[in-house]
Design a protein with these regions (language model features):
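Generic low-complexity segments that are intrinsically disordered, proline-rich and/or Lys/Arg-biased
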Residues: 19-20, 65, 104, 320
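Cysteine-based protein phosphatase catalytic domain of the PTP/DSP
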Residues: 25-252, 256, 264-312
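N-terminal alpha-helical scaffolding segments that mark the starts
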Residues: 1-33, 38-41
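Extreme C-terminal disordered tails of eukaryotic proteins encode short linear targeting/docking signals used
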Residues: 312-321
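Long, low-complexity intrinsically disordered regulatory regions
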Residues: 1-2, 159, 321
Length: 321
């Protein structure tokens, strides 16, 4: 039996937006996303690509048909608003009682959510999966509050529709810092949905968006082991700091969003969190699984770690890098 763990809204958002040349959602064994709410709630609105978790006549959750869960990279389950793994729902019941006494209204229709539907469903799925089953912390309510543009009423997704899905930038610091590519940086709908106001462009190419003065920091370097990205780290960090301080979301991007932009964000996390290169690397890798700064950038990041922390604490000769 696999483990059942919590998954934040940001983690699910990033899972949905992983890509290589195409969205990872097009891979049949990548993600099984299950909605454990009622049929009515599911039909009203659910997270894109989610399937409704079915139950038998005794209200026991059933394994989804035609899905090989033991081969799935991710299995994520959500209900309305589960926020812990104990499943007792005491906080939710307490909140409902407060609403009852204040408004004299109690909606019994939603009482079945207090028993931790997502947890019950996840435990059934964990009996056949190899990897941990994730329960979405905060459920649909929290996720849809942050990412309203990922709500859908579509029940069936055709393969071509999945192939045509255009991923959004990866979220590094919730609501404030994103990692993307040139196409995403040029998409007005993405900028609006994520409330992105500022860009750090780590590529030779410009975007087709005209940003106000002071809202873009351009680092025109090629993706080469000989490129001196280090000289731009201090001013880039100051730029990101100044915009995040005013709750202004920043998108850091390069042509493909894999090497140059990843390197700059690793440098920023070392500066921002005063963490090691290894810790910053692990965070970016967790957010974007195919990030890969070139070897020249790795050496520069090692120098940056020493400049910020006073010591070189990460062994970059390790094959991991």
């Amino acid at each position: 039996m696999a483990e059942v763990i919590l998954c934040t809204a940001t983690e699910l958002y990033n899972i949905l937006n992983q890509s290589t040349k195409f969205s990872k959602l097009a891979e049949p064994n990548y993600l099984c996303l299950l909605d454990a709410r009622s049929k009515r709630e599911y039909n009203e609105s659910h997270i894109i690509t989610a399937k409704r978790a079915k139950q038998d006549e005794d209200m026991h959750f059933l394994l989804p048909e035609s899905i090989e869960l033991d081969c799935m990279r991710y299995c994520v389950v959500y209900d309305s608003r589960t926020d812990s793994l104990d499943g007792d729902g005491k906080r939710l019941i307490f909140n409902t009682l407060i609403k009852y006494y204040i408004h004299k209204i109690l909606i019994f229709e939603h009482c079945h959510h207090f028993t931790g539907q997502a947890i019950q469903c996840a435990k059934v799925m964990s009996q056949v999966t190899r990897l941990p089953v994730r329960v979405l912390k905060g459920g649909y309510e929290e996720f849809s509050g942050y990412y309203h543009f990922f709500r859908s009423q579509k029940v069936f997704w055709m393969p071509q529709e999945i192939d045509d899905f255009r991923p959004y930038p990866i979220e590094i610091i919730p609501g404030l810092l994103f990692l993307g590519d040139l196409q995403q940086a040029s998409n007005r709908h993405i900028q609006k949905d994520l409330k992105i106001k500022s860009h750090v462009n780590v590529s030779l190419e410009p975007t087709n968006l005209a940003l106000p003065s002071g809202q873009e920091f351009h680092i025109p370097v090629p993706d080469s082991c000989d490129s001196d990205l280090l000289q731009f780290f201090p001013n880039a960090c100051k730029f990101i700091d100044s915009h995040m301080a005013t709750n202004c979301a920043v998108l850091v991007f390069s042509k493909l969003g894999i090497s140059r932009s990843s390197a700059l964000l690793i440098a920023y996390l070392i500066h921002y969190r005063k963490c090691t290169l290894q810790e910053a690397w692990n965070h970016i890798l967790k957010c974007k699984t195919n990030m890969r700064p070139n070897r020249g950038f790795v050496k520069l990041l090692s120098e940056w770690e020493k400049a910020i922390l006073g010591h070189q604490l990460t062994e970059v000769a390790d094959p991991t890098f």
